[in-house]
Structures are given as C-alpha cells and as structure tokens.
C-alpha cells in the first residue's frame, strides 16, 4: 500500500487556515515563504506531542515540519521510544524566524491572539492516548508553559536538535529517552529496547522521515539526508537558502548516485 499523509482533518485544516497574521512582525521571519504547521497524526491518536521552534527550508519544500537534518534527529529520538506512527510534531511559530532575530520574536508567543490560536491547536490535536510531551528548545518550552490546558502527562524540556551545545544536547536527550521509555507505549512496529544515545551523535541516531508523514509525490530521498551527511563536503540538508537572496530563494539539490 502506498503510504502518504493525506493532510489534516477538516476541522484542523479550518483552524490552521485561521492562523493569526504575522505581517506586523514580518521583518523577524522568512515571511514571504508562508506558514508550515505540522508532521504526524492530527486525529488525536498521538502518544507523544513534539513541539519545536519553527520550520526551515526543507520543511517549506515538504510542507511538513521537522523533515530536514533536525527533523531526522527528532525521528531518531522517536525511534528510540519505539514510535513509528503515534506522534505529532508542531512548532511554537508557524513561520520560520530569522536566526539573528530569534530573541526579538519571543514576545510574539505571548500575544493574546497568537497564544489563543496556538493553545486551541494543541488541544485539538491531542486526546486521551497522549502519554508525553517533548519541547525542543526555548520557544517550544515557552509555548507549553503558556498552554493552560496542557494534559497532565510527562513533559521533557530538551535542547533543540540544532543546538550548538553538543554536550548538553546529547546528555539531555539521553536522559529524556530514559524517562519517556517508562511511560510511552511503543507502536507495534517499533522497538524501545535498542541503544540510547552515546557520548555524541552518530548516523545511527538519525532516522529517515516516514513516507506516511509526507504528502503524496515527494521524492523517495526527501527526509533522508544520510548520503549528504556522509559525503565530502558534508551536506546536512538537500535544501538551503541562497546566500545571494536569503529572503526569497531556496536551493534544492537532488542527491547523486
């Protein structure tokens, strides 16, 4: 059977379409590329809710979040919990922020309209099956702290997968996996008894994005940058921003061979 993500249920799609305007803050974001909302299950069946900060270039191509190098690290994290399907990933912001302006964008999270829309989304996509929440990075942590109706489940607050503090990243992720394994029920096709993280990230700690998380018609290699990570020079993503036109041009390279 061909696996692909058919898109959000009608009620969730209607809510996503009502995302509050970012136009007043467009100088803080890659605004003209538009919003990107989710990856995974939106039918309230998720056992784990993952919240990151914002989407990146690869996510724009995929129209799904956490698909590039950072997303493949998160997928490896999910794999260590034995989750192959029962998860949902969203972001604190619907738009990608400019890295140099990330702290300036923090107050937007607390704007009443943004906070209300985000909290309603989170409450719409989780249900009684939820067993845990993971926040990846500062913005995600703030988003959960502002979620007044957050379910009473285990919440692990860890660094973003792109954190430059490699030691804290691997240490905190290792501890989170240990704790979450005590409460997250693995999927039937998953295994939570494999190795945890070691002293540093290795290729075995990554996992490709499942085809069932992506729209129909995506290339087979989108969401799996293992060849690029092992190439010289190393390419962690097939999609990157063009240095000559950072705001409006993406470069998408198909792997060779």
PLM segments and residue spans:
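A polyanion-binding, active-site-adjacent surface
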Residues: 1-180, 186-257
């Amino acid at each position: 059977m061909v696996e692909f993500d058919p898109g959000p249920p009608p009620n969730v799609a209607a809510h996503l379409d009502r995302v509050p305007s970012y136009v007043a803050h467009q100088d803080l974001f890659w605004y003209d590329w538009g919003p990107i909302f989710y990856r995974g299950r939106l039918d309230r069946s998720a056992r784990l809710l993952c919240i990151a900060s914002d989407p990146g270039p690869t996510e724009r191509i995929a129209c799904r979040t956490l698909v590039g190098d950072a997303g493949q690290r998160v997928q490896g994290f999910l794999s260590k919990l034995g989750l192959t399907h029962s998860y949902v990933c969203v972001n604190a912001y619907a738009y990608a922020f400019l890295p140099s302006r990330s702290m300036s964008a923090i107050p937007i999270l607390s704007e009443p309209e943004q906070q209300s829309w985000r909290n309603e989304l989170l409450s719409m996509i989780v249900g009684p099956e939820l067993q845990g929440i993971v926040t990846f990075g500062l913005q995600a942590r703030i988003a959960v702290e502002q979620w007044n109706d957050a379910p009473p489940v285990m919440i692990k607050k860890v660094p973003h997968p792109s954190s430059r503090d490699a030691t804290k990243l691997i240490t905190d992720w290792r501890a989170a996996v240990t704790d979450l394994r005590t409460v997250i029920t693995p999927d039937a096709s998953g295994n939570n008894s494999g190795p945890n993280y070691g002293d540093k990230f290795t290729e075995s700690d990554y996992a490709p994005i499942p085809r069932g998380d992506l729209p129909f018609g995506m290339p087979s290699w989108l969401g799996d940058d293992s060849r690029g990570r092992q190439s010289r020079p190393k390419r962690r993503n097939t999609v990157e921003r063009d240095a000559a036109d950072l705001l409006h041009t993406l470069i998408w390279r198909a792997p060779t061979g």
